[in-house]
Regions:
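Active-site-adjacent structural elements that line small-molecule/cofactor binding pockets in enzymes
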Residues: 1-127
Length: 127
């Protein structure tokens, strides 16, 4: 499923239609989504982390760097932000029927502090 709320809703509605057509219980299906995740204690820290990711990938991606980084800088990425922002966005997705999120932390090989912050502040708030 797409991580964007509107796409998640549309795909959920389509899935519901299919389950009705084949006689399957829609509520028995766990819906998940993938999220690129960059989290920091402050918005300034998030911006610094995104800059660091860009600096790491730019030598390899060249002209494609801007496209690669677009989601991270878009302001619409649900799991890019402070713990409070991420909790708010994922809480909305949970209310829409998201069963679990699959989070990719692009900086994990270099810095685990974002993952630690997510584990410490986001997961308990959503449990």
């Amino acid at each position: 499923f797409s991580g964007a709320p509107e796409e998640f809703d549309a795909k959920s509605a389509l899935l519901r239609e299919h389950t009705i057509a084949v006689g399957t219980d829609f509520d028995a299906i766990v819906r998940s989504s993938n999220y690129n995740t960059v989290i920091g204690a402050t918005e300034a820290e998030v911006a610094d982390r995104i800059d660091a990711i860009e600096a790491r990938v730019a030598p390899f991606l060249g002209k494609r760097t801007e496209g690669f980084m677009r989601e991270y800088r878009s302001g619409t990425a649900l799991c890019v932000g402070t713990p409070e922002q991420v909790v708010e966005r994922l809480s909305d997705m949970k209310a829409r029927g998201l069963g679990y999120a699959i989070n990719y932390f692009p900086e994990a090989a270099y810095d685990r502090s974002g993952m630690d912050l997510f584990a410490r502040e986001v997961i308990p708030a959503l449990s």
